[in-house]
Structure formats: C-alpha cells, structure tokens
C-alpha cells in the first residue's frame, strides 16, 4: 500500500476496514506542492510497501495577501444549480518577514450523482468445443443520489531563524457524504420486477497538526526535528 503524509506527518486512514486515505479531504488551494517518492528511502520509516505522497502546505508570503474564490456549478444530470465552492485565505509576514501567518477556509457542496446499469447473461451449458447462445437473465437500473458537503480549515505559523525555520501547521477537514440509491430490478427468468431503496450517511473528520524545527548547522550538516498529531474519525 502507499502512504499519504501532510508536511511529513502521516495522515490517518479514513477507512475503518483498511489503511486507505481519502485524499479528497485535502483542498488543492491549501497546497504549495506535492512530493512523490516511488520507494522508501533511508530517511523514511519502513512502514510502507509502496510509495509515499507528501502534501506540502502553503506558508505566508511577504506582504499582506488575501484571496477569495467563488464557484457556482450546474449539474446537468440532476438539473440542479445548488453546487458551490468558496475559498477564502489571508496571510502576511511580520518583523522583517521573520514571522509568517496564514489562515484559510474552504467550503464546498457537490452533487456526485450517477446512473448505473447492471446486467447478467447466461450461456449454460458452456463447453469449450461449442458456441451457445447467450440468454439475458436480469437487469438492474440504479439511480444513485450522492451529495458531498466539505469544510476545510488551515492555519500555518512559521518563524525564520538563522539558517533555519520553526513552523506549526494545523489542518482540519470534514466531509459529510449522503447517498440514496433507487434500484429497479428486472428478473427476466422468473418474470418479476423488484424495487429497492437504500440510504447511507458517512461523516469523516481528519485533523493533522505538526510542529517542525529545521536548521542548517554546516554546509553538509543539518538538523530536522518535529512532533505531530494526526487523527481521523469515520461515522457511518
């Protein structure tokens, strides 16, 4: 499996049954860059068989900066215009650009609905030396109504020291997934028709905090120390 980290801190799994991580919890507007390591290196923990994806969070830039992004989205499948995305951020550096502060919030509501088609065929008895006609046994038409409501917040504090940096980053991401399924089942073999309805709600919360100290002592010698906290909660 692969490992997901934020500023070098392992992001806790968001799935209760495996080690997978839902990377949609991280807004693209919070990122300065992405580091991809295909195989483990000597400076990394040996707790992953695959590669590592490290999301690098933004830091405040010199001068006062503010940014607002608004998006309105029309969904043609559901014929709705209620989807939106709002991003607001503010940042500045103080004391001759030594101290930096950055805060950002990201609000998003998206319709992820879809239509699914499932079918089953029979060709019994299936022999390798013969060609049998296929018979259509059943078909399932499903209308899947999905809605994702996400809230992300980010706070980054950093201070420049001689040949180094001390920083704190706090990421809090919440997403609520509502899904309702309406299925129309055509059981052709028994000449029957069934209707099924199902509903599911999934609330995911991810928190990641990191204190980091970096300093270059000599041209070929540097020190890097950090303490971190990572948590995920999945209610369904």
Predicted regions and their residues:
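Transmembrane beta-barrel wall of Gram-negative outer-membrane proteins
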Residues: 79-181, 204-219
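Outer-membrane beta-barrel domain signature
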Residues: 42-44, 75-78, 140-144, 192, ...
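Extracytoplasmic beta-strand/coil segments of soluble accessory domains associated
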Residues: 1-10
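Short strand-turn segments of transmembrane beta-barrel domains in outer membranes
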Residues: 33-41, 52, 57-92, 142-143
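Outer-membrane beta-barrel pore domains and translocons
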Residues: 37-39, 56, 69-75, 106-108, ...
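Flexible, solvent-exposed coil segments and beta strand-coil junctions
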Residues: 15, 31, 62-71, 126-138, ...
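Short acidic/polar hinge/loop motifs at secondary-structure boundaries
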Residues: 9-38, 88
């Amino acid at each position: 499996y692969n490992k997901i980290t934020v500023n070098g801190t392992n992001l806790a799994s968001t799935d209760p049954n495996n080690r997978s991580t839902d990377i949609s919890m991280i807004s693209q507007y919070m990122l300065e860059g992405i580091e991809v390591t295909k195989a483990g290196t000597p400076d990394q923990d040996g707790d992953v068989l695959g590669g590592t994806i490290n999301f690098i969070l933004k830091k405040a830039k010199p001068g006062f900066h503010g940014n607002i992004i608004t998006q309105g989205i029309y969904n043609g499948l559901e014929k709705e215009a209620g989807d939106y995305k709002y991003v607001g951020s503010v940042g500045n550096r103080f004391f001759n650009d030594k101290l930096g502060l950055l805060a950002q919030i990201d609000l998003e509501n998206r319709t992820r609905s879809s239509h699914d088609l499932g079918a089953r065929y029979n060709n019994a008895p299936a022999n390798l030396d013969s060609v049998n006609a296929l018979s259509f046994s059943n078909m399932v038409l499903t209308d899947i109504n999905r809605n994702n409501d996400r809230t992300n917040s980010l706070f980054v504090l950093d201070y420049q020291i001689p040949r180094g940096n001390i920083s704190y980053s706090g990421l809090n991401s919440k997403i609520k997934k509502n899904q309702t399924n309406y299925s129309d089942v055509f059981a052709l073999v028994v000449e029957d028709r069934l209707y099924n309805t199902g509903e599911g709600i999934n609330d995911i919360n991810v928190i990641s905090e990191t204190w980091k100290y970096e300093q270059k002592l000599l041209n070929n010698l540097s020190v890097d120390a950090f303490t971190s906290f990572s948590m995920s909660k999945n209610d369904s």
